[in-house]
Amino acid sequence: MPSNRGVVYTGPGKVEVRSIDFPKLVDPRGKKVEHGVILKVVATNICGSDQHMVRGRTTAPPGLVLGHEITGEVIEAGRTVEVIKVGDLVSAPFNVACGRCRNCRERNTGVCLTVNPGRAGGAYGYVDMGGWIGGQAEYVMIPYADFQLLKFPDKAQAMEKMQDLTCLTDILPTGYHGCVSAGVTTGSTVLISGAGPVGLAAAAAAFLLGASVVIVSDFNGQRLAQAASFGCETIDLSKGGSIVDHLERILGVPEVDCAVDCVGFEAKQQGGEEQPSIVLNELMTVTRAAGRIGIPGLYVTQDPGAKDEAAKTGNLSLHFGLGWAKSHALFTGQTPVMKYNRGLMMAILHDRIHIAKAVNTAVISLDAAPQGYADFDKGAAKKFVIDPHGSLTKAA
């Protein structure tokens, strides 16, 4: 049996590359899954949601194999897999979804009802998401292959565009979903809170959807420069001033049509103090009456590192009366990746969006993953793509 290595969370602030079991066609509860496949991982990315766990801001246990952004080549298929074949190059949505339950049939694959005994929704390599082993590894098992996997039509073309296509597993559909949920359309003015990879992906998606002005706010100057590099207006929160005043300066009016929260529960206010509700409250302040707010930023039910007891259980101090008075619609939750990934794949393959350039992908080896985590945590304006087998280096 081949060997396997993966990125393992070992405690707050620590990840290591370790030898792990080679995957089998077995689910986390020990049941044989003939609907699954084994992938040789071609690309797997470090995500901001992984950082929440690594910072000790969740109940993730040491020993958890990280990674939910997985692209790979099929090397083994279960006996009931009919459509996906050995040798196919595929993108795996970060959601684990059965394709059979009510939610999956209604395209709400982010909250599949069967893949996680604890609650609706599953994901690879993530705490409380069903125990599915993560894909920041050389090899990984993907269940429900015929339903879940997106096959690339031309392997050679896909390898040439892999730094773009690897973003289909999470951040591009997530940013796009945030914008669609916020009602972004032709001519919209859009405020994106957060200039990390998801925020940058949301900004790129907003342009794809036809936004006239896309504004990105953050404290990180390097990430704001990255946003500006593909046409975004920016608000540097480290320089002070109210969001309202900044919008007035940029747009001539103190509000936007649509807003997207790409920050989540580790939001900070001026001075660096955590204030988990600050982004949501600011977005309600500046979104026009009858506007919509997309919230792909992660909010959790358990945060052991929160500053107060309420926030430790996901209870936030929201100015909800303002949102009600302005007839806002707020949309939250895991992105149903399968709703968008094929269309976004076609946009990439036909050069309608250059997401790798927008998020500034940086390819690293599996052994360099711990340093990638450290650099990302320091605010690097990059999207780290792990290349476990050197496949992307060979294709370059």
Protein language model features and the residues they cover:
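Conserved S-adenosyl-L-methionine
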Residues: L208-V213
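NAD(P)H dinucleotide-binding glycine-rich loop of Rossmann-like/cofactor-binding domains
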Residues: C98-S193
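Glycine-rich cofactor phosphate-binding loops and adjacent beta1-alpha1 units
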Residues: A182-V184, A225-S327, P370, T393-A396
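Short glycine-centered segments of the SAM/dcSAM-binding site in methyltransferase folds
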Residues: L89, T189, R292, A329
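Conserved acidic E/D residue at the C-terminus of a beta-strand in Rossmann-like folds
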Residues: D218
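N-terminal Rossmann-fold NAD(P) dinucleotide-binding loop
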Residues: G199-L200
